[in-house]
């Protein structure tokens, strides 16, 4: 069975764990219909359009 040769220091452990919880920047693009920012390849939550077609009924 494999055994580590040396103990991993606390700072190395914390540095490795910190990468897991790092905030991920989300790419945003403007909706061609209303101009609001939305996530790519998803329905616009402001107007309900996706690829030029009405998909969701948005009540205002």
Curated annotation (Swiss-Prot):
GO terms for cellular component: cytosolic large ribosomal subunit. GO terms for molecular function: structural constituent of ribosome. GO terms for biological process: translation. Keywords: Ribonucleoprotein, Ribosomal protein. InterPro entries: Ribosomal_bL32 (IPR002677), Ribosomal_bL32_bact (IPR044957), Ribosomal_zn-bd (IPR011332). HAMAP family: Ribosomal_bL32. This is Large ribosomal subunit protein bL32. Belongs to the bacterial ribosomal protein bL32 family. Coiled coil: none annotated.
């Amino acid at each position: 069975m494999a055994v580590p040769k040396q103990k991993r220091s606390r700072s190395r452990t914390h540095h490795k764990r910190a990468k897991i919880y790092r905030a991920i920047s989300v790419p945003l693009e403007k909706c061609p219909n209303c101009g609001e920012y939305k996530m790519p390849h998803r329905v616009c939550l402001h107007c309900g359009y996706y690829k030029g077609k009405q998909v969701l009924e948005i009540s205002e």
